[in-house]
Amino acid sequence: SNTHFGSLVLLIPLALAAGRIADHEQDQETKLEEELARVLRSTAVQDAIDFYRAFDLAGARVVQVDDFSLKDPDWERKLIEGNQSLLELMRLSLDHDIVAREWATDFERSFQLAGRLQDMVSIYGLNDGVVRTFLEALAEVPDSLISAKFGREKAVEVSSLAVDALLDSTLNK
């Protein structure tokens, strides 16, 4: 459920931003990035509360944090008193959670990887292009879900395995 939950947390603001610009013919990519930034900055405390409730219902797992922890029985009161928007919560976790980092950086890595994916697919075809892009992304940044479930050391080990896979000559056939 973590993977699905994280995917939705990334896709929902993208879909909302894309829907807002769908009728315009100009530079869609630039407009998408700009509209996405507006969507993220428009989040409020209620969005953070709803996110926490959904997070709890989904049984998603992340690295434990000190501030605004879901394990804290007073998390909702603290969110309200701290006037914490969903974007502000994501900024608190950007150093240890990939999804939070995307929110905090206006999806910078997602847009970079989209361009890389496009290039890889044009060179290697759909399947191999997707696999290569995924391996490169995993090699560059340890996966926060692996880190949450098995520890940072294991996540770094998996990233190292992705590097090895990219260096394997059979991948280039």
What are these regions, as identified by a protein language model?
Residues 1-2, 158:
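Short intrinsically disordered, low-complexity coil segments enriched in acidic
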Residues 6-10, 130:
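Catalytic-loop motifs flanking and including active-site residues across diverse enzymes
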Residues 9-19:
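DPxDG-like acidic metal-binding loop motif
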